[in-house]
């Protein structure tokens, strides 16, 4: 799954939810 780095929220296929998404 993609997890927002430094965020608790998970990326739902959208990178706009965070600056950088990393493979979790």
Swiss-Prot record:
Keyword field: Disulfide bond, Neurotoxin, Secreted, Toxin
Subcellular location: Secreted
GO molecular function: toxin activity
This protein's record includes keyword Disulfide bond: yes
Modification after translation: Contains 5 disulfide bonds.
Any one of the GO CC terms: extracellular region
Tissues expressing this chain: Expressed by the venom gland.
Disulfide bonds, paired cysteine numbers: 4-18
Superkingdom in the source lineage: Eukaryota
Function description: Potent toxin that may paralyze and/or kill insect pests such as H.virescens (lepidoptera), S.exigua (beet armyworm) and M.sexta (tobacco hornworm).
Similarity comment: Belongs to the neurotoxin 02 (plectoxin) family. 02 (plectoxin) subfamily.
Name listed for the protein in its UniProt record: U1-plectoxin-Pt1e
């Amino acid at each position: 799954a993609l997890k927002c780095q430094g965020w608790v929220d998970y990326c739902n296929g959208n990178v706009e939810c965070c600056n950088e998404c990393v493979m979790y």
